[in-house]
C-alpha cells in the first residue's frame, strides 16, 4: 500500500468520484440530511434514500449511472447509534457513504470488477488482505469473484438466511416487505491475526479483525406479497462504502477516530477543553457530534422539543455534557465549527455558506443548556447516591428531562458511566401523566368525540367552499346535543350539525372555522363555528334560533362572506411570510404552528434568536413586494410525490393523503395547503407585522394584520404619533428629537437628584454615628432612615463603617409600607458576629427574609411597629456574641 499521507479523507472522496466519473457515471451531489421526498423518514440514513423513487419506478433520471458521497445520520428512530458513539471504534451519528449506482444499466460483472480495480489498483490495498461474502445461492457473483477477479475460494464466504426467515440474510437486501430486493456481496478487509475476531459467518465474526468496507447490492427481484421473487426487467446496482472505515484502513490506523479528519477535530476539542489525553472518549464524542449538529443545521434543522429538532438538541446536549465532564464551564462547542469547515468545507460548500447560522444556533443552545446543566448534574448526583438496586427511578429521570432539559438518553449515558440503569417504564409513565394533564387542561368544554358506531354510518363531508359561500342541498347526517347523538333538536338547543356537504370551512391548518347561517323549512341555525370531527366530518356548531331540526332534513348554508374574506387574506399572507422568513433568516425556518383569524394572523416558526428590527423591516417589505406583484394564487391538486417534485414544502410529522392540494403564489411560495386563499396576492392589500417574540426554546412568533386590518393598524399608529406630538408640543416630525431631548434632561435631573441624596445621606450618617452604643469595645448601631432605598442604605453603611471602625450596624429604610434592611460587620467584630445571621433574625420579625456574607447582608420586610421593636432588640442580640 502507498504511504498513508496520500490518502487523506479529502483525497479518498476525490479518488472515488473521479474513478467512477471515468466509468461514465454522473456525479450527483449529496442529498440533505432531511429527506425531501419522504416526510415520514426522520433522516437520510443511507446513500440510496435520494434514489428510492428511481428504484421504485416513480421517477426517471436523465442518467443510468451515478456516483455520490452522501452524508448520513443515524441518531433517531429505528436507526439510532447515539449511545454507542465515542465508546466504540466505528459508531458515528454522522457518516459519509461512498456509492455508485446503476439504474438498469451495468450489473454484477462491472460492479464487482470496478470495486476490485479501485481498491487494489487505485488505493493499492493488498489483494491477500481482502475477503468477500456472497449470498448462499448467488452462484453468479461467486463465479465472478473466483474466475474473473481471481479471489481464492477460501476467501469467498457464502452467507445463508441467518436471520430466521427465507431471504432474511446479511447478504440479501430488501427495501421493504415487498418490492425491489436482491442478493449482495460484501468486501471485508483483514487486519491480520494479531487482531481478535473471525471471518464473516463464523461464531466470532463480531471481532475487529475483519472489517466490512464495501457492500454491493444487486436488485434483481420484485418480492411479491406471497414472498415469491419475480425477476426485475431492468436489474439495478446499489453500492455503499463507509468513508470513515475506508480512511482508517488507508491511513493504517485501527479506529475511525484516528483518521486525519477526526484527529483535527479532536485536537481542537482538546485545545478548547484543556484535555491533553487525545484518547479521551469525551473528545471523541465531541468530535463526532460537531459534524452531526453542524450539518443538521445546514440542512434546516434547529434545536427544538419535537421531531428532528429534538434529535439535534439531544446530540448537542450530549456533547455539552461531555465538555462539562472535562471541566468546561464556558461555551466551547460552536468554536469547533471553523475546524470542521477546514476539513469538510471544500467537499460540502453548503457548510461554509451557512457557517454563521450554524455558529449562532449552537451558541444559543449552549447558553440555554448552560443555565440548567450544573443544577441538573447536582440533582443527578443526589438521585444516583440514593438509587436502590442500581436503578434511577423513572420519576427522577423525568424531572431531569422536564425541569433541567436532560434528554432521557443523556441521563442513561450518565447512569451507564456509574454502572446504573434508568427505570424507562417509570419515565414513560411520568411522561404520559404529564400529557394527560395537558390534554385535560387543553379541552374546551370537555371536547366532543363522535361515537365509533356513528362514524361507521357516515360518509365524509364534501367541502364546497373553495369557490362558493352559499350552497343548497345540505342533508343533515347527524345531530349532536350535549356531545351525544340525537335524532332531533328544538329551538333554543345548542347543537352540532353534520351534513353531507357544506360551503363552511372547518377549522384546520391554523385557519379558523367559518360562521354564518343554516336555513330551511322554518329552521334557522346561527353557525358560531365549524369544526372537523374524526378528520372528515364538518360539524356546524351553533344554536337553533327558529324551528325544529331532525336527521335527514335538507338545509341551505350561507357563510359569513365578510369574515371569510378577511380570513383568506391572512391565510395567504402566512404563506408569503413563511417564504420571506426563509429568504431573510435562512432555510432552517419551518412553520411550527399558526392561527389564521379574520382580524389577525399568528405564525410560529423555528429560529434560534430574536429577530432584529432591521430584519423584521426587510421581512415585511418582502411580503409587501409580493403583494404588489399581484401574482396569481394557483391551486393544483396532485399526488403527494408529484407535489414534492413540484417544489411544494411538506412539514415533517404532518399526515398527508395520497392526493394533496398545492398553493403556488408566483415563484415565491409553493406549499401544501387545504385552506382557502385569495385569487391574487394583490388582494391582500397591505401586510403589517404587529409583534415578534419567543414562544419556547427555538420557536419564535410573529403576529400581523392584512387588508383593512392593516390600514386600521396604520391609522391607530398615526393617531398615537399625533397625540404624542401634541403632548410634546411639536409636530410628528419633531417627536424623536423631542423625546431624545427629554431623555437627556431626565438623566441630568437624575444626576442632580443623586447628588442631593448623597448630601442628605452624608448628613444623616454623621448624625447617626453619635447614636452608636459601645459593647465590649465594638460600636453597635441600629437605625431607621426614612426614604432610603437599598442602594442608599449600602452607601450609608460604607460611610458608617469608615467612621465607626469596629462595629455592628443595622440600617432600615422605609418606603411605601415596605422596609429595606442592610446589616454590616466591621473590624474586630467580624470574627464574632455574622451579618447574614443578624439580618435573617431581624427580617423574620417583620415578615420578610434576607441573608448575605459575614460582613454584609441585605433583605426586606414590612414597615410597621414590628420594625421598631426589631431594631430596638439588636443590641440585646449582639451583646452575647461579643
Swiss-Prot record:
It is an enzyme of class 6 (ligase). Zn(2+) binds at residues 571, 575, 673, 677. GO terms for molecular function: alanine-tRNA ligase activity; aminoacyl-tRNA deacylase activity; ATP binding; tRNA binding; zinc ion binding. Binds 1 zinc ion per subunit. One of its GO terms (biological process) is alanyl-tRNA aminoacylation. It comes from the Bacteria. Its cofactor is Zn(2+). SUPFAM superfamilies: Class II aaRS and biotin synthetases (SSF55681), Putative anticodon-binding domain of alanyl-tRNA synthetase (AlaRS) (SSF101353), ThrRS/AlaRS common domain (SSF55186), Translation proteins (SSF50447). Its main location: cytoplasm. Keywords: Aminoacyl-tRNA synthetase, ATP-binding, Cytoplasm, Ligase, Metal-binding, Nucleotide-binding, Protein biosynthesis, RNA-binding, tRNA-binding, Zinc. Gene3D superfamilies: 2.40.30.130, 3.10.310.40, 3.30.54.20, 6.10.250.550, Bira Bifunctional Protein, Domain 2 (3.30.930.10), Threonyl-trna Synthetase, Chain A, domain 2 (3.30.980.10). It catalyses: tRNA(Ala) + L-alanine + ATP = L-alanyl-tRNA(Ala) + AMP + diphosphate. InterPro entries: aa-tRNA-synth_II/BPL/LPL, Ala-tRNA-lgiase_IIc, Ala-tRNA-ligase_IIc_anticod-bd, Ala-tRNA-synth_IIc_core, Ala-tRNA-synth_IIc_N, Ala-tRNA_ligase, Ala_tRNA_ligase_euk/bac, DHHA1_dom. It holds the Pfam family tRNA_SAD. Its EC number is 6.1.1.7. It is found in: Cytoplasm. One of its GO terms (cellular component) is cytosol. Transmembrane segments: none annotated. Catalyzes the attachment of alanine to tRNA(Ala) in a two-step reaction: alanine is first activated by ATP to form Ala-AMP and then transferred to the acceptor end of tRNA(Ala). Also edits incorrectly charged Ser-tRNA(Ala) and Gly-tRNA(Ala) via its editing domain. PANTHER family: ALANINE--TRNA LIGASE, CYTOPLASMIC, ALANYL-TRNA SYNTHETASE. Belongs to the class-II aminoacyl-tRNA synthetase family. Consists of three domains; the N-terminal catalytic domain, the editing domain and the C-terminal C-Ala domain. The editing domain removes incorrectly charged amino acids, while the C-Ala domain, along with tRNA(Ala), serves as a bridge to cooperatively bring together the editing and aminoacylation centers thus stimulating deacylation of misacylated tRNAs. This is Alanine--tRNA ligase. It comes from Stenotrophomonas maltophilia (strain K279a).
